[in-house]
C-alpha cells in the first residue's frame, strides 16, 4: 500500500518511551503538505501514546479513538514546522489506555490534550502486528523517512441549514477512497476521528460567522467506526456560556449518534 506508514503517520521519531515516564517524539510537517489542520497535532499525540501502549502489550492490542476530555489549540503551525510531542500514559491495561499530552512548536505550546481514553482492541483486526513491531523499531532508532505526508483534503461538508450565530446543519461525506485509509487502518479502513473533529469545527465556525476561530474541543466521544463512503448528518447548536462561545456538535450515521463534542470558539 502506497500510503502505509506515510499518509497518516505523524511521528517521525520516538525519543523516549519508558513506561513510567513521559513519552517523547518528534514530527516535522512536510514543507510540501497542502493542508495540515490543527487537529492533526492531537492525532500525533494520540499516535505517540498508541505506540508506547502497543509496545507495552507486545503489539497484541492497539488503542482506537474513544474519549477526549479537552483539547486546547495554541500557537499556529503549518508546513515546515517541527512538532515536539509529549504523551503521559496515566494507565495502560488490556481494556484501554488513558493519557494526556501536548505539542510544542518552537518552544511554544501548540496543543494541549487532557484526559484522553482509547479502548483496546486486537491489533490484528486493524493491522499486521509484525509490521507494527518493525515500524516501532524504526521510529526508536533511525527514525522514519521525512516528507511522508502530502497533507489532507478539506472536509467535504455541505451546509443544508444555516441560522447565523445560532445553528448549522449539513452533511459530511466521507470519501470512498483516500490515501490515509491505507494508514488508518490497513485491514479495517475507518475515517480518522481527528479529521471528523476538523470538519465539525469548520461547521461550528461557519455557524458562528466571520472573525471566529476554533480554540478547542471538550467532551469528545467517538461511538462507532465510520467507514469509507459513508455520509454523516452533522449539526451544531451555539450558545454563550458565561461569555464563552461554545457549540454542541453531533454527528449521526444512519440515524444513530456517531460522535459528539463541544467546540470552543473565540471572536477575533
Identify the function of each model-found stretch.
Residues 44, 63-65, 166:
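N-terminal cationic amphipathic segment used for targeting or macromolecule association
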Residues 99:
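Short beta-strand/loop motifs in extracellular/secreted proteins, especially
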Residues 1-35, 60, 74-79, 90-96, ...:
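Non-catalytic linker/capping segments at the edges of enzyme domains
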Residues 33, 37-51, 186-189, 197:
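Compact, glycine-rich, soluble single-domain proteins
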Residues 29, 46-49, 174-176, 201:
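Generic secondary-structure microfeatures
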Residues 102-104:
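Internal, hydrophobic beta-strand segments that form the core of beta-sheet-rich folds
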Residues 49-86, 110-111, 117-118, 201-235, ...:
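Hydrophobic beta-strand-centered segment that forms part of the acyl-chain substrate-binding groove
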